[in-house]
Amino acid sequence: MSEDSEKEDYSDRTISDEDESDEDNFMKFVNEDIHQCALLTADSISDPFFPRTTQILLEYQLGRWVPRLRKPRDLYGVSSSGPLSPTRWPYHCEVIDEKIEHIDWTPSNPEPMYIPTGLEVEPLYANSKEETVVYLAEDAYKEPCFVYSRVGGNRTPLKQPVDNCDDTLMFEARFESGNLQKVVKVGEYEYQLTVRPDLFTNKHTQWYYFQVTNTQAGIVYRFTITNFTKPASLYNRGMRPLFYSEKEASAHNIGWQRIGDQIKYYRNNQGQDRHHHFSLTWTFQFPHSKDTCYFAHCYPYTYTNLQEYLSGINNDPVRSKFCKIRVLCHTIARNMVYILTITTPLKNSESRKRKAVILTARVHPGETNSSWIMKGFLDYILGNSSDAKLLRDTFVFKVVPMLNPDGVIVGNYRCSLAGRDLNRNYTSLLKESFPSVWYTRNMIRRLMEKREVILYCDLHGHSKKENIFMYGCDGSDRCKALYLQQRIFPLMLSKNCPDKFSFSSCKFNIQKSKEGTGRVVMWKMGIRNSFTMEATFCGSTLGNKRGTHFNTKDLESMGYHFCDSLLDYCDPDRTKYYQCLKELDEMEKHINLEKVIDDSDTSLKEITLDLETSSHASDSSESNDSQTDLLKLNSQIKTKKKQLKTKKERNSTIERHQNIREEEQEVCDKGHLVQRHKESDSDVTDTRPSISDDCIFDYFRRQLPNQGFFKILGLKFYCGYTHMISQTVIQKLSRDQQRCVLGTDKKNQETVQPRNNDLYGNCIKVTSLKCPLNKQTPIWTEKTRIPTEDLHHNLKSNMKECPSFQSKKADINWTDDEKRIYRDKNIAQTQEILQYLLPIMRSTKNVQTTQIKEVFNPRTSFQIQHQQKPSSNINIRKCSTSWTPPRNLPLISQRTLIVSTSKWLQPLDWKSSESSLPLGGPKKRRKYSRVKATKTKDMKAASSKWEMTPSSSEKDADKSLQAEGSSQQGTMQTAPHPTKTKGEQPKKKHGQPAFHLKLQRDT
C-alpha cells in the first residue's frame, strides 16, 4: 500500500495529518490578480485531457490555462471573501430582522449573591380572561416534529399583541437564542411570564432570554416566570437574574449585570397531571425611561457570536497558520458544526508522535457558560505566550466549540431539533437524527487509530450546585492505580484554581442513565481521562470569591487554568504528579473513615464488604492499616445472595413473633419479671453515657454473652431477652422472688470472658457490677464464654446474625410489623449491653498503630476490672494510646444516646484529648470531605503551591512503624486498679495524655 493511501481520510470533512503539517493544499481565496483573469470550468472547454467536471477551474495566466481545484464553499464556513453562513431556522419560527448585539464588559467588583430576608412574596395567579396578553409567540407545537428549515424562519408578517401603550412594557424574544412564550399583565406594574419549552418537547423550561422596551425609571416592576419544572434551583441559594441596558452600555460602557430584589423560587398551583410547576419572581427598577433592556438566565453566547469569533481567527494571518477551521458536519436544520484543529505545523513525521486532546462544548444549548469557558481556552491556546506555544508544539487539539447549533439558534435549553438530548445519544447509530454527536464519535475513533488521546473533556453548565467541578469515570474493577490516576487532573485543576474549582464536588461514578453521555462513551472507547466539566450558573463558595457570582472573565479564566493543569499533568518532571497521587491516597483513607463514622446504620458485615470492594482492600499493607488482619480474614468469606421470602413465609414470621410477644406478656402478667437494675423505665433511659456520639464504639451491634436462665416458679426465663420494668412492680414481689429474679442469692461476681477466636465478640472481662437492693450487696453468678475453635465459621455466623436494618431492607420486602420487631430487638440489645459498663475509647489522632491493633485483636485478652464497693461511684482510669487513623474503622457508631441527668459517665480530662482526634473533634469532622489548596499548620513555608512537607499524621505513621518493628508481640497493658487512681492527675503514656472516666450510678 502506498504512503498516500495510508493518509487519514476523514469522510466527515475533518482535517488530515497532511493538513496539520503542511500549508493548505487547496488554493487560496481568489486574489486581485486572479479576479482580472478569465475563469472557466473544465466542462466548458473541449479539451480531451480534462474530465468534464465543475470542480476544476481554469485560470488564464501568463498566456496559458492553469487548472485549479475548486474548494468547496462550506469546507470552512467562515472566510474573508464573503459574509458569514446565514443561520437557518425551522420554517414556522418567527424571527425579527433586528440583530441583537451586546458589549463585553466585566464589573470591577464581584457581584454578591442575594441574601433572602424571609419577607419575599410568592405571587399565585389564576387564569382570568380579563388579563391583558402583552406578548404571545407562535405556537411551539404547531408541528409535531421538525419538517424543514429556511433562512430567516417564517416569512409572514410578525404579529404584535398590543399597541405601544404609555405604561405597558413591550416584550420581544423572536431573535437568536431568545426564549419567551407568553406575557400577561396581571397588575399595573406586574407581569406574569411563561417561557417556551424546547421545540418538539413539552419540558425543559429553564432558559429565558427576552427583550423589554417602553420602560419607566423609578417604578418597581415585578416579573414572575411561572412554568419552571425543576424543584431545586440556584435562585433559592442567592443567584440573581442578569440584566442588560442599551443606554447603560452606550453611556457608561456597562454590560450584563446581576440585579433583582425580592427574589423567590417556589412551587405554584399550576400543576397539571400531578406535575407541579415552579415560579421565579423578582422586582426591579429600570435605570432609564424609554430604554431597551434584556433579561437572561446566563450570559448569552449565540451561534452568530461563534461564527464571528471563528471568522476573526481565520482572518488573522498568525493564528490561522496553526488553527485550521473545518466543518465537521451539518445539523438536521443544515447549520454547520465547526471543528478546529490546533497544533504547530510540521513538515516531517514528528507530528504523528504528538498526543491529542479533545474538547467539546454546548451540547446543551442553554448552558451558555460552557461557551465562555471554551472562548477562554481558545484565547489562551491561540495566544503568544510561551506556555501556549509549548502546548501547540506538544499536542494536537481537536475542538468542537458548539455541538448543538440548532438548539442554540431557537433558544432551547437542552435538546436539539430532534427533540432529544444529544448527550444521551452518543451510542446511537442514527446519523441523520444526531449528526453532531455521531460525527464527533467517528472523528475521535479515527483519531485514536493514529495517535493517543490523553484527555477528553465536555464542557457543561450546572443549575443546582455552586462552583466548577468535574465528573469522571471509575470502572467496576477499581484498580488502585487507575482509580487514583483518574482523579489527578481534577486535583491539579483545583490547586491551580482554588477559588473556583471544587475537587470535593467531583464525582467519578458511572450511572446507568449516563451510559449514553460523551464522557462515558469516550471512556469505554479507551480514553482514560474522560471528563465532563460542570460550571455553575451562580457563583463560588470558595476562597476570596465566596458568596459572589461568576462573570464572563471568571468563566474564561477556567480555560487558562485548564491549559495550565494540562501542562502540569504532562510535565516530564513528575514531582507534581506523584505528589497529587500521594495526596489522593491519603484522602481516600480519610473519606473511608468518614463514611464509616457518618453511616450510623452500617453493620460490621457491610463495613467488611465495603473494605473488600474498595480500592485499598487489595493494596493495603500491614504497616499503614490497623485492620489488615480483619481484611485477611474477611477476604476468605464468600457471601451468599439472600433469597427473597414469599408472602406465606413473611406471614408465618409475623405470626411467630406475635406468639413470642404474647408469651412474654403472659409472663409479665403473672409477675415473673426480671430487672437487672433498680431504676425504673425512665431511669433506664437516663443511664446512657453523656458524651459525644463520635466517641462511642459500636458495641451495640455485637452479640451479647450467653446469659443462661433463671428458674422462677417452675418457669424458664432467658435473661438475654427481657424487658425493663418499673420499681413499683418489683416491690410487689416477695423478698424471695426478688432475690430469685435479681440473682442476689447467687455468687457475688459475674465475669464475661472474651472468646479468643471471636473477632466480633467482646474483648473484655467485666467484674463486680453493682446492683444493690435494700442496701444489700448483689451477688452475680460467674458465667464464662467458651471460645469457639472454628474462627471462620464463627465470623460468618456473627456477621449473618447482626446485619443492619438498612442492609436487610435492601434484600427483603419488610412489612411494618417486621420493621417494628427488628427495631424492638435492637433496642432490647442496646439496653442490655449498657449494664456491662463497656469501656468507651476516644479516637485519638496520635495513637500508635501497634497498640490499637491489640485493642481489636481477638487474641489479646485485656481486662478492665472494677472492685466491688458499697458506694455508688466506680472510678475507671483509662490510658489513651497513640495510633494512626485506620483506613476503615469498623467499630465506631453515631447512634444517638439519651444523656443521663446524673451524668454517670464523665470524662475528667476532656480537653486534653480533644486535640488528638483524627477529625479534629466532633465539630470538625467534615473537614476531610473538602479539599482545599491551602497551607495547613503541619506544612512548612513552601516556595510555591506545589511544595509541601509531610504532615503530622505521616510523621506519626512513621513512628508507629518503628514501634511495630520493635514490639511485634506486645500486648495491651491492664488498666490500673480504680481505687489507686482516685484523685490522681492525668499522666502521659507514650507521649500522649491519659484521661479518667468516672462512673456514678444512682442507688
From Swiss-Prot:
So where's the catalytic machinery, residue-wise? 534 (proton donor/acceptor)
A GO MF annotation of the entry reads: metallocarboxypeptidase activity
Ranges of compositional bias, category Polar residues? 963-976
UniProt keywords (A-Z) are: Carboxypeptidase, Cytoplasm, Hydrolase, Metal-binding, Metalloprotease, Protease, Zinc
Q: Which cofactors does this protein require? A: Zn(2+)
Subcellular location per UniProt equals: Cytoplasm, Cytosol
Which residues are recorded as binding Zn(2+)? 364, 367, 460
Quote the cofactor binding remark: Binds 1 zinc ion per subunit.
Q: GO CC terms on record? A: centriole; cytoplasm; cytosol; microtubule cytoskeleton
State the residue spans of region: Disordered: 1-23, 642-662, 911-1003
Q: What is its EC number?
A: 3.4.17.-
What catalytic activity is recorded?
(L-glutamyl)(n+1)-gamma-L-glutamyl-L-glutamyl-[protein] + H2O = (L-glutamyl)(n)-gamma-L-glutamyl-L-glutamyl-[protein] + L-glutamate
- Taking the first listed entry, what is the main subcellular location of this protein, grouped into a coarse class? cytoplasm
Output the GO biological process annotations, alphabetical, semicolon-separated: protein side chain deglutamylation; proteolysis
Bias class Basic residues marks the residues at 922-934
Identify the residues that the record assigns to the Peptidase M14 domain, covering every copy. Answer: 299-570
The annotated regions of Basic and acidic residues compositional bias extend over 649-662
Q: Gene3D superfamilies in the record, alphabetically? A: 2.60.40.3120, Zn peptidases
**InterPro entries associated with the record:** Cytosolic_carboxypeptidase (IPR050821), Pepdidase_M14_N (IPR040626), Peptidase_M14 (IPR000834)
What is its EC class? hydrolase
Role, per record: Metallocarboxypeptidase that mediates deglutamylation of tubulin and non-tubulin target proteins. Catalyzes the removal of polyglutamate side chains present on the gamma-carboxyl group of glutamate residues within the C-terminal tail of tubulin protein. Specifically cleaves tubulin long-side-chains, while it is not able to remove the branching point glutamate. Also catalyzes the removal of polyglutamate residues from the carboxy-terminus of non-tubulin proteins such as MYLK. May catalyze the hydrolysis of aspartate from the carboxy-terminus of target proteins.
Q: Which family does it belong to?
A: Belongs to the peptidase M14 family.
Q: What is this protein called?
A: Cytosolic carboxypeptidase 3
This protein's species is Bos taurus
